[in-house]
Amino acid sequence: MQDFLLVLLSTALVNNVVLVKFLGLCPFMGVSRKTDAAIGMGLATTFVITVASAACWLVEALILEPLDLKFLRILSMILVIAAIVQFIETVMRKVTPDLHKALGIYLPLITTNCAVLGLPLMYIQGHLSLAMSTLSGFGASVGFTLVLVIFAGMRERLAQLSVPAAFAGTPIAFVSAGLLGLAFMGFAGLVHV
């Protein structure tokens, strides 16, 4: 139990996928203008990364390794992730059409999100077990969602303030992202691996 908690803390806070590994920067900057859209994107990404971590591990262990087809690893991962994203998009279109419309092009782009592809690949290459791979994927995606929602809140607040013209828009977003990264550096000593 303690190992699971350490994995969750280290993947969500200490080794944050956005702020430490620099994966998932496109949705981090693109979907973080509104908190509602950030929450929806974060939840969808959490589901996709968690399921993709398990599914890609299973494809690797049950198909690619026994048949010596490791050269098809990335292609097979993209296909698995695309199927999961299509499932999420279909469910979201039926259940929450407003959120589906708010996420727009970023929802199908989850397929090509480097965090969604990179994390399962890192877990497979790190020889993690199925449980640890899935748990690490869940923790990393929770960290992604946390950072995305916090950053969206910061950007909403900044939109209400009087920002100098030279810093308006993207420059102040980059400065804010840097400050958020500095804040998360405080978690660096939390987990010693």
Curated annotation (Swiss-Prot):
UniProt topological domain (Periplasmic) ranges: 1-3, 60-70, 123-133, 192-193
Bilayer topology: Multi-pass membrane protein
Keyword Transcription regulation found: no
Residues in compartment: Cytoplasmic: 25-38, 92-101, 155-170
One GO CC term on file: plasma membrane
Database matches in InterPro entries: Ion_transpt_RnfA/RsxA, NqrDE/RnfAE, NqrDE/RnfAE_oxidrdctase
EC number: 7.-.-.-
Keyword field: Electron transport, Membrane, Nitrogen fixation, Translocase, Transmembrane, Transmembrane helix, Transport
Listed GO biological process terms: electron transport chain; nitrogen fixation
Pfam families registered for this protein in UniProt: Rnf-Nqr
Subcellular location: Cellular chromatophore membrane
TM regions (residue ranges): 4-24, 39-59, 71-91, 102-122, 134-154, 171-191
HAMAP family to which the protein is assigned, alphabetical: RsxA_RnfA
NCBIfam families: PRK05151.1 (NF003481), rnfA (TIGR01943)
Assembly information from the UniProt record: The complex is composed of six subunits: RnfA, RnfB, RnfC, RnfD, RnfE and RnfG.
Chain's role: Part of a membrane-bound complex that couples electron transfer with translocation of ions across the membrane. Required for nitrogen fixation. Necessary for stable existence of both RnfB and RnfC.
Family listed: Belongs to the NqrDE/RnfAE family.
UniProt protein name: Ion-translocating oxidoreductase complex subunit A
Gene giving rise to this polypeptide: rnfA
